[in-house]
């Protein structure tokens, strides 16, 4: 007889290799065919809503690793919530207006000048939709479940219509105004920029010290002194109208070889060193406020430069006397307003000097630096020229330097709602907690928001002008424009005359002849995405404002978190979100930023081709995403190894359930042996820990708990021990059915617990569970597992956890015996233990076959105490252990070594246990 035929070896079609790159798309096709998103929404209808509102990625180019991290994190949360008592819709969105699309079209050879604005905008829209289709395909490949057929898109008419209403509501509350103000200006984009569109990079700039001769000392100065300023922007000297000092600082008049200079007392030493004044002395000291209204002369124009007082002056650097050009700086502008100074801005939108800078007109501002410095030297005003490398604002899209330039722009007042904004921040839950400090400080310190852009591709600012130039924004015009946009899209603004965009018969006191013009600027794209709480959460029936969660990268504290907060508080007085969670950036394996030049860019599509989406998702779960995270081939291989172990654990359990039907064969929980109940108690603990980790968005804890449970609790303990029962015992024996009961409960629970992170694998497991109690086609249509009721659970855990410590001792002794070649596999060993008192009591109380549990052929507990163990015993923490080779023959069927092999003459190579099983169940 071939005894192999009598063993119940695992059988399953669940493959050992994941082959995810091939299998995942097949699974996704299946989900699509069953319309899984709709099914989940129908199943969870009527439950409390959990709304994670998707921050819209920009519709341009392939997705990068930051996108993948972001979308996978969102998907894990949404999937978990929909299995945890919530209805969790997920509506993905796209941000579609702005310069990158205009630039992309220019690169494709689209000549904007050769077509009307409306035509150009149609091309932009077409391009945006192509990009959306491309990105949608890539996001779906990540396994992200959502309403992909009905996303929100910022260029859609219904979205733009709501955005106009947000603008109108803000205008109605007096929060929108037009003003001449210095704003970040990008010569390379020829447009104003918001703070969120600025990034800081190192730049080399000239560093000059310039002397302004005093013209009228007002009795405080003699009139022959020269006030020393320091600047890194010589091109702004032609726009100088004042010199600012701090009212409370001391200022020295110093003598240097007969010439007198004015500098802040605290900086005199460093200025002297910088300029190279060898011998200098203090002639007198005055307070800044005494210098107010002293008149200096511009170094090379016939023009005064007034000394003014400003709280913004510091002694961090420079001279304490600040060159002030109201057209080129926010502080300069504000102090200029206070003193009634004109706003002079001799630089055009392309960055070229104008006629208002005689001698330099037509020069690009960077080139003018040199010419102006030479001019200062000619007139004897240049005290020192050097160069510094410093952090300087750049246009985040063109990567070129920006300038401050006073222009007429539309602004949203932050000042008027600042306290409400700060209160809303306080009422929001920020994860991590430092997020609150970050956004609080930004909102506390930020200026008003410049919302106008001098471009074509965006939502028009819905303002009309009367004959006298007065801006017109009324409830009536806003309502009408909003309805027009809903019907025709915002292109209608560029296709029709102003009169055709106004309500029929509209009149206004500013236009007695009924002639109106319209604004040509568009809104900042941050106003687009920042209006999504109104245009998406309020507009759509399946969503609600405030959202439960916004989740984006940490760059969005100044971006979307901020613009959404500003518009929502302006319109509703409340934040648009209850909670905000931020993640870090994705770096390479060495912690460097990814860049094409370094050749260290890891692309999601490539990772999925090589490893599969579930591996990428498992990587997301494995990292501390609230800080910056690292990814590399090596890291992904480590994650793949963890995946392989989890998969193998599933495969082993599935293979050993091939003949198990829980409805027919399950053993009632109360009738299971202790070790089986202990395993279920461990499963209960896992369920509680994993759910808690998901609830607190701690996916790394889910990853570690699941990995530990599969490798340590299951593979290395229970499953290893259970093989002797599963393969050897009779198919329908109580012991085997008990183990199968545990395996069934465990495989079902684990498939559900891992489903939010590994949806493809979880569903593959689900399909392969034989005779499932829950007859649903996808694990996504189930709920998270509940703990199994076990009598005396805590006492059971305490007792068996203590046994695991004793087991560790015995395993150490076995390992040492193996290394010393005393034994081979553990089944060739005979073990005698000499326990300490506690351990003796424990071992005596266990309702289990310890020989089987320890996977040895013979096991005995000596009568002698621990201290009386013979010299050959290895003394460990709880027991002293003697390991010897087991005596007897090896049973051909179960591999146990015993002297009783052949006791049944009809089975000379079997132990009595196997002979009995074969006789009972397999005899011909």
Curated annotation (Swiss-Prot):
Record keywords, A-Z: Aminoacyl-tRNA synthetase, ATP-binding, Cytoplasm, Ligase, Metal-binding, Nucleotide-binding, Protein biosynthesis, Zinc
Motif placement: 'KMSKS' region: 593-597
Entry's EC annotation: 6.1.1.5
Superkingdom of the organism of origin: Bacteria
GO biological process, one term: isoleucyl-tRNA aminoacylation
CDD domains recorded: Anticodon_Ia_Ile_BEm, IleRS_core
Cellular component GO terms, alphabetical: cytosol
Cofactor, how bound (note): Binds 1 zinc ion per subunit.
A GO MF label: isoleucine-tRNA ligase activity
Binding site for Zn(2+): 891, 894, 911, 914
Reaction equation(s) it catalyzes: tRNA(Ile) + L-isoleucine + ATP = L-isoleucyl-tRNA(Ile) + AMP + diphosphate
Motif 'HIGH' region, residue range(s) on this chain: 57-67
Domain notes: IleRS has two distinct active sites: one for aminoacylation and one for editing. The misactivated valine is translocated from the active site to the editing site, which sterically excludes the correctly activated isoleucine. The single editing site contains two valyl binding pockets, one specific for each substrate (Val-AMP or Val-tRNA(Ile)).
PANTHER family in the record: ISOLEUCINE--TRNA LIGASE, MITOCHONDRIAL, SOLEUCYL-TRNA SYNTHETASE
Family: Belongs to the class-I aminoacyl-tRNA synthetase family. IleS type 1 subfamily.
Protein name: Isoleucine--tRNA ligase
Upper classification of the organism: Bacteria, Bacillati, Bacillota, Bacilli, Bacillales
Gene: ileS
